Regions:
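Peripheral terminal and linker regions in Fe-S/redox and tRNA-modifying enzymes
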Residues: 1-210
Length: 210
């Protein structure tokens, strides 16, 4: 078809679907929204003094650049906790780390932790003023690897090491790749890259969208 013709056909199909029977009524959306409560956000500045001071620390800045994402409420950020240390099995965390993360969530994120298919954790409501202290705590726990969305942020299924359905090993490949690209400057130079590894055709590692 070619990209231009395909784009036109998608637009034509959308015109037929838009406003049709699959469109959600606003009353349904409002009803679902009513089942969720928002945290008690404070009115905070966009750039607090704590963040300005911490910006002089290159380790903090590298982590902030790769692990901290915009929030819809001013003064807050979303923080992704990478579970992809160099040489470690992707997505693994110890019981001690999870206990500590639960405490950090209570202290900095209204008690909320989220788990994504990327095999990382997220603290969804962190005040920007708290980012420097949170970074120090995560660094002590080994959870401040600044590689989110980079070449070493690899998704891998358990593979043949743990899964009876697999016909190939996934984890050792992921571990070796993280060692190969362990230098953070190299990973930054490569830029945003998603490597997904599956040990069989069931594609639990989402290799088809890597």
């Amino acid at each position: 078809l070619g990209i231009e013709k395909f784009s036109r056909e998608v637009e034509e199909e959308w015109k037929q679907m838009d406003g049709g029977g699959l469109t959600l009524d606003h009353s349904v959306i409002d009803e679902v929204r009513s089942r969720f409560s928002y945290p008690a956000y404070e009115k905070l500045p966009h750039m607090p003094d704590e963040l300005k001071q911490a910006a002089h620390d290159p380790l903090f800045e590298r982590w902030r650049k790769n692990s901290v994402f915009p929030h819809k409420v001013q003064g807050y950020s979303i923080v992704v906790l990478s579970l992809k240390p160099v040489g470690g099995p992707p997505g693994d965390a110890t019981a001690e780390q999870m206990d500590a993360v639960a405490d950090l969530a209570d202290r900095y994120s209204f008690g909320e932790i989220r788990v994504g298919h990327e095999q990382n954790l997220a603290l969804p409501h962190v005040a920007k003023r708290d980012l420097p202290q949170l970074f120090k705590a995560l660094d002590r726990l080994g959870l401040a690897t600044p590689n989110v969305n980079l070449v070493t942020d690899i998704i891998a299924c358990p593979g043949l090491d743990y899964c009876s359905l697999a016909n190939a090993r996934s984890i050792p490949i992921a571990q070796e790749l993280t060692r190969r690209f362990a230098n953070h400057d190299t990973a930054d130079l490569i830029g945003r890259l998603h490597i997904n590894i599956s040990g069989c055709i069931n594609a639990c590692g989402h290799h088809h969208v890597g």
